[in-house]
Amino acid sequence: MLRLVIDDKIPFIREAAARLGECVFLPGAAITADDVREADVLITRTRTQVNRALLEGSKVQLVVTATIGHDHIDKAYLAEKGIAWHNCPGCNARSVAQYVRNSLWIAAAKGCFAEGERCFNTDERRFEANERDFATDERAFSTNEGECAANVPTTDKNLGNLPHSMTHNVAFSKAFDPTNAPFCATLRGLTVGIVGVGHVGTAVAEILAAEGCRVLRCDPPKGEPHTLVDLAREADAISLHTPLTFEGEHATFHLADRSFFENLQRCRVFINAARGECADTAAVEWALSEGKIRAAVIDTWENEPHISASLLRAALIATPHVAGYSADGKANGTRMSLEAVARHFGLDAHFDIPAPALPAGFVYGALPTTLTHRLPERALAQLRLYNPLTDTDRLRAAPEDFEQQRGNYPLRREEIR
């Protein structure tokens, strides 16, 4: 019988894993060499450093991480010892895509993408400034999807005429105040740069394209067509979705450094849902203070769980590394982990790990009324399923509970299709 040591915070796994062998469940960050000495399999998450210190002298034949990321695994050591490993590519990609899209909806409602000259067209259907409601003119929202009437359908031919697709450089105020900004609460026509186009970046690109965004894909190792220079020149928002790497021409450690932000010409919102160390915390704070960006959306942090208090205060959305924490993504990761074990040992075992159903009338935290009147119903429906401001409020109230908030994350679902 197989002996498995399993991170006790991996959801939906206990009953299913018992079909594979004898299971021991332990806190991921507390798993020791003694714990795994007699184990055949280690199933973990990113909080367990899988290396020589942990595995030397053990019987472990297979390491599985129930995550997309795998920089916590010393793969060179595992290869040296002939220990196999698997991750769960794409398991929570749609969850991260949901996080990015919903964060951009909130940024749009806050006025982060608005300029006075960009919020009206020639027939003077314009948005009011400050915290006032939209103008009462019934043309303020279009009848088909509740989008802002100032927009036109998104096509390659007319993208350049959309409110968010103008290519001129706009001077930023160092003290952007969303309460005094004109706004256009739509994602249609935004140009969004995605850095890192693996499973997650691809899912983000797809969900934003469905909202009418123009997407610039930047991933030099994959031969994607756009560069960081292109994104700096054209993107209204930039979202990081790379692994963390330290060597080579395309190393991603501090990819978003001071020079990255200095080169931005029109970017309003910066998002890090990759790894914390892909962005230099001091550089992000500088960019906010100097008006190089208007808002930061930070899900991954340097030095987790001991995160920057100043960036926590300054970010528009600040969450404890939970962008991929939908129940759907977790269920996918658990299923893929168990299937990897079964395949490795030649076991005839298949796993169906359904995500829990939502209760009737489910709402993932209420939106402020100052935002709800700025958003179309389609956006509000998405935000009822997941509102990242709720996670932000929770983290700001108790940043010392970073790990507990991850380990005891509330029920969240992706779109129910």
Please give the residue ranges for each predicted region.
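Phosphate/diphosphate ligand-binding glycine-rich loop within oxidoreductases
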Residues: 41-110, 170
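Rossmann-like adenosine-cofactor binding region
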Residues: 50-51, 221-309
